């Protein structure tokens, strides 16, 4: 606990410097960072944590938090539309070893524009602050902390509700002000939930696969890791936008796209069965279920084991010309031990009660 870790460097003409301290282990307790010049202490920073940092990017289903979307009666009514009550929302995390920064909805500055409550420091995701952080990233962090209690988790939330993917690409204003300032920053992975805006019109929906492949390459490039873990959510069942199926298929296709420089450490979380019966609203419930699935994928990547995935159908063909009987083929390794299950689309659904066995025939093909 009292061990010292040291390193030295030299500032440039502009008085800026970078320094790397090797092999500092993660721990639940904070470190103290001390800067010395010619043997004299110049600055001391307390409460420094070493752990895994994730970028939470995309649009409103990643940004979705209590303070902005549910706390005030007007915002609650517009987002819920009588589908559920506040008691149905997930519980906040309460963990000082989950820290977060929320990037503000501002453009035009080269510096990362943080929300005013983050202007001076990372905030702990405790009872006082967690309502300001998106449900999905905080619940993802909570899952990781359950598995690794000695590793603090940091979240940099860059998500911006109501935005199309073009604004998140290198030529877009969100990229310029929310992602480019992180150039060279060492992160453990990227969490992405976006695509609703692009599903509203045909042209952006048809371009989504190409744009999303480009985005994955660009984010990995700016962060200096060609196979940086990139975990994303496939769009949910919401039917308010005509081209949602096209975007959803594009998100599936990217898993095996030649346009992605490497599909290693790329993982898609299915959300079709997680909404607890709230598919009529664009911000469905079930973020804790998505968080568990994404955390399982990250832990598999970390452990270099097979990334969990739902069955991935590759083709469907009539049997002997009979359209009433179809033979479905699946990508290798994604369909072992298949059985028909019925989704639990009630407000009481949990990660452990999400499905039940059924003898009903398969539907929806």
Region locations from a protein language model:
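Cell-envelope and extracellular/periplasmic
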Residues: 1-365
């Amino acid at each position: 606990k009292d061990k010292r870790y040291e390193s030295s460097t030299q500032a440039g003409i502009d008085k800026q410097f970078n320094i790397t301290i090797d092999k500092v282990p993660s721990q639940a307790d904070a470190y103290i960072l001390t800067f010395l010049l010619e043997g004299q202490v110049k600055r001391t920073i307390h409460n420094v944590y070493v752990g895994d940092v994730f970028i939470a990017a995309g649009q409103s289903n990643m940004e979705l938090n209590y303070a902005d979307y549910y706390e005030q009666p007007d915002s609650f009514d517009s987002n819920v539309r009588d589908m559920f009550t506040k008691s149905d929302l997930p519980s906040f995390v309460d963990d000082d070893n989950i820290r977060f920064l929320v990037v503000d909805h501002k453009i035009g500055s080269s510096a990362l524009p943080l929300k005013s409550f983050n202007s001076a420091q990372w905030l702990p995701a405790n009872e006082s602050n967690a309502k300001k952080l998106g449900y999905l990233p905080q619940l993802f962090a909570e899952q990781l902390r359950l598995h690794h209690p000695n590793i603090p988790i940091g979240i940099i939330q860059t998500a911006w509700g109501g935005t199309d993917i073009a604004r998140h690409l290198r030529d877009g204003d969100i990229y310029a002000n929310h992602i480019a300032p992180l150039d060279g920053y060492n992160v453990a992975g990227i969490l992405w939930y976006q695509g609703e805006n692009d599903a509203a019109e045909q042209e952006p929906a048809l371009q989504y696969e190409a744009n999303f492949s480009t985005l994955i390459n660009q984010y990995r490039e700016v962060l200096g890791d060609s196979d940086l873990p990139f975990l994303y959510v496939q769009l949910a069942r919401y039917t308010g936008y005509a081209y949602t199926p096209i975007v959803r298929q594009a998100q599936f296709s990217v898993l095996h796209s030649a346009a992605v420089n490497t599909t290693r450490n790329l993982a898609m979380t299915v959300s079709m069965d997680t909404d607890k019966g709230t598919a009529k609203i664009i911000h469905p419930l079930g973020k804790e279920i998505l968080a568990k699935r994404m955390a399982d994928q990250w832990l598999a990547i970390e452990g270099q084991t097979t990334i969990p995935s739902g069955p991935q159908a590759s083709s469907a063909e009539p049997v002997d010309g009979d359209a009433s009987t179809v033979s479905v083929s699946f990508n290798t390794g994604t369909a072992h031990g298949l059985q028909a299950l019925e989704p639990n689309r009630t407000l009481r659904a949990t990660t452990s009660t999400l499905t039940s066995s059924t003898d009903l025939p398969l539907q929806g093909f």
